Amino acid sequence: MTEKINKKDNYHLIFALIFLAIISVVSMMVGSSFIPLQRVLMYFINPNDSVDQFTLEVLRSPRITLAILAGAALGMSGLMLQNVLKNPIASPDIIGITGGASLSAVVFIAFFSHLTIHLLPLFAVLGGAVAMMILLVFQTKGQIRPTTLIIIGISMQTLFIALVQGLLITTKQLSAAKAYTWLVGSLYGATFKDTIILGMVILAVVPLLFLVIPKMKISILDDPVAIGLGLHVQRMKLIQLITSTILVSMAISLVGNIGFVGLIAPHIAKTIVRGSYAKKLLMSAMIGAISIVIADLIGRTLFLPKEVPAGVFIAAFGAPFFIYLLLTVKKL
């Protein structure tokens, strides 16, 4: 039975990878100008001889690559948060991590944009970490029900959004415009430098994931049971929280405030993959990547010549999905 599940999981992972590759190639082809598949393939074979080098290399490739990396980061972080909080509707944007990172990023854009832009991810990570620590303080105060923890997270997110809106009203018009574009979640202006930064962060946290993955089946159990089986529960939680906070904060610092990916991707992944936690993590990463690539593709082609941020389409699907989970998930 286990072998049959593993085979199915492998097939699903391969299919997801192929689908991600196909949708990425389609995204390379479609935009303000259509580039035939043959010319896209020629660019990959010999970029320097391609007549579409500028469009593909400067405008589309960085954007698609960043969408894949950001989606993967958000998908993995969502799965880890649901595991740590033992709450099926936990996600970075719902429990306030995204809000904390967004507030810090907007503070940077509004008041410190004259400094190097490379400090923006650092500000976002610090904001996300503060939000997570506040949530942990509430969790360690006693036996808080999962629903209560989610309500606290939503309250924090609402507070952060209110503070962001206040900043946008009082700051300079140009800075406010930059912050607004970032807040709605757009991949416009993505560069290969952005993809390198996020790619390096993801690679840097891989060793932390290897510490977590082998023990995930035990950590899913209730804390007393896991401790009885020899698991350092608090250490495992801390590793996952640090990893997920870094991934979320770095991703949204580069692509903006794209919500609900960390909620949707893990649920779809857990529905498709029934086996190991490692495969669920990989599937969450791929579902997250696919969702942002598709949302960005729709956003920049559906209303040409105008462009709608990817975050708008993710939210349009994610909000009803969240309500559905609230109505159907048991034992909250």
Where are the regions that the model predicts?
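Alpha-helical transmembrane segments in inner-membrane proteins
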Residues: 1-332
